[in-house]
Amino acid sequence: MEHARLFAYDDWANREVVSTLRAEGAPAPALRLLNHIVGAQWVWFARLRSKEPKMDVWPELTLEQVERELEELRRGWRDIWNRAIQGRSIEYRNTKGERHTSRVDDVLTHVLMHGTYHRGQIATLVRQGGSTPAYTDFIHASRSGAV
């Protein structure tokens, strides 16, 4: 399956989480994890473009700011597909300052899995708070035509 479709799913799932947190009230730990998803995506996006990240991996954003950042990221990831950098490798420093080289495809897969992992944590927090978490299963997105 191509990364572009999976990033469309990732964007949809993040927006579903935003909608749920807005409707149910965003517990601070859940919002912090959603912020981390956004911050980490900006860090990886910057690494792919050999630029400095817009924010760190644990930013403090409101739900409204998260929405705006997700919209900007959606456009940015589309630009990545247009630049056709898949199949290449990038060199970067991690948050500890250690130098690494990774395949772009591996970075993209990591970004997707990272978001899925933390959305699962958010779902647990929402459920523990007595609310129903966003239904973000990929198959649901596919069946509903979201991706």
Put a short name on every predicted segment.
Residues 4-57, 96-147:
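Short, contiguous alpha-helical
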